[in-house]
Amino acid sequence: MLALDKVRYEYEHEWFEFDLNVADGDIVALMGPSGAGKSTLLSLVAGFIEPVSGSIKVNDQSVLGLAPYQRPFSMLFQEHNLFAHLTVRENIGLGLHPGLKLNAEQKQQVVDAAQQVGIADYLDRLPEQLSGGQRQRVALARCFVQPNPIWLLDEPFSALDPLLREEMLALVKQLASERQRTVVMVTHHLSDARAIASQIAFLSQGKVKVVSDCQAVTAQHPHPELAQFVAAALNEPK
């Protein structure tokens, strides 16, 4: 389980305080208005920034003070996931060894991962030779070859067209289920959350205001801020 307890952080005189529990195997979508603290929460968990106080634990073990690479998380962002000078094969291989010193079994893992995400034909290409969707497939492959039990996704597919986004989300859901991974994903698309998540954590004004079963999140939700947010989201063009 990932557990955040009274995690406080200050940025430009604005305070954030997060409480959130994510059970093993769950997929939780972080949603809320701009500036609510979604990416801040993810950055605190990942270790890119440190809280003023509070605790962040994975299976009752604190991760505070650990560098990002020492924490049990794999991360996927909207962009800047790949090293431009490395091939697809090498970019995926980094998930197994930072120096790319792979044994025969690990080299086969890279090939298998590429096949699972549909990029086996591009293993020796550079990222600049790929489309945006193909680059995100490479990043996803590197994400899941790592042994880390929790994936942190920060709007990884928001720049893709709706059909491709839907395909990538289905792939994440499938791979997470097969590998029994926990997923925490920031998204501003309600449809994305409904496609992949078991729960939605709604953030507003620097706090997690409510955590709700994904299918119960409607414009009639009893929490007024969440209901208003959903109503606005449903009226937005897809």
From Swiss-Prot:
Residues annotated to bind ATP: G32, P33, S34, G35, A36, G37, K38, S39
Keyword set includes Repressor: no
Bilayer topology annotation: Peripheral membrane protein
EC number: 7.6.2.15
Record field: catalytic activity: thiamine(out) + ATP + H2O = thiamine(in) + ADP + phosphate + H(+)
Domain of life: Bacteria
A GO MF label: ABC-type thiamine transporter activity
GO cellular component, one term: plasma membrane
Principal EC category: translocase
Keyword ATP-binding applies: yes
Keywords recorded for this protein, A-Z: ATP-binding, Cell inner membrane, Cell membrane, Membrane, Nucleotide-binding, Translocase, Transport
Domain ABC transporter: start-end pairs: 2-230
Subcellular location: Cell inner membrane
PROSITE patterns, A to Z: ABC_TRANSPORTER_1, ABC_TRANSPORTER_2, THIQ
Function, as annotated: Part of the ABC transporter complex ThiBPQ involved in thiamine import. Responsible for energy coupling to the transport system.
Family: Belongs to the ABC transporter superfamily. Thiamine importer (TC 3.A.1.19.1) family.
The protein's assembly and partners: The complex is composed of two ATP-binding proteins (ThiQ), two transmembrane proteins (ThiP) and a solute-binding protein (ThiB).
Protein name per Swiss-Prot or TrEMBL: Thiamine import ATP-binding protein ThiQ
Organism: Vibrio cholerae serotype O1 (strain ATCC 39315 / El Tor Inaba N16961)
